[in-house]
Amino acid sequence: MISFKQKLFFVLYTVLGNSTIFGATFPVLPEFQVYHTVGSRGSTYTTGALGISLHLFDDPSGPGRYLHVLALSIPEKTIAWKSKVGSLYLSEKASGFEIGVHDQWQMPAGKGATLSLRKIQWPKVHEGDNEPEEASSDILHMGWNWITGTPIITVWLLGLDIANLNLPHDRKQEIQIALGLRTAF
């Protein structure tokens, strides 16, 4: 009897193993983002994101649609400031993931929009001299991107987020704004 894991592996092997079909139907593109976020409850942090975008389809009269999956990394501090979530400072690097859809238009070139969900784990956050504790964030991200000229050198990213901050002794909602750069496709 074939187990569920074996069946799943066989299906994945069949789809992914035939690179001609997989590559022609669903091209996979690398994606990189870096952006700085500020929030209405005091959050301020810089995020680096690395992952892939899977091309789903092109709308003949509109955008191409991509499914993206990103690994997120937030350092304890950057050049000019310490990272904060709400009013709490990070004691070590945080990480998370993002999954969402991204629409990218050809005309006008560089115009795009994203809707995604993010989950960030803040392993050690503290306020003052208090003992560091764990926190997390669940974020609904809405983003827009555009280019500043041709040839395409810079793709700007603007984000508006609604975040649920699950802090050690409190839960808060926060509106966040982010500005950064992303890869072009």
Each predicted region: which residue ranges?
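Cleavable N-terminal export/targeting peptides
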Residues: 1-27, 185
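Short glycine/proline- and aromatic-enriched beta-strand/turn motifs that initiate or cap beta-hairpins
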Residues: 20-86
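Short loop/turn motifs that connect adjacent beta-strands in outer-membrane beta-barrel proteins
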Residues: 22-28, 56-67, 104-113, 146-157, ...
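Membrane-embedded beta-strand positions of outer-membrane beta-barrel proteins
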Residues: 28-34, 67-74, 99, 113-117, ...
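Transmembrane beta-strands of outer-membrane beta-barrel pores
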Residues: 34-40, 56, 71-80, 105, ...
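Flexible, solvent-exposed loop segments that connect beta-strands
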Residues: 38-42, 75-94, 122-136, 166-170
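Membrane-embedded beta-strands of outer-membrane beta-barrel proteins
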Residues: 48-54, 99-101, 140-144, 177-179
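Outer-membrane beta-barrel "beta-signal"
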Residues: 172-185
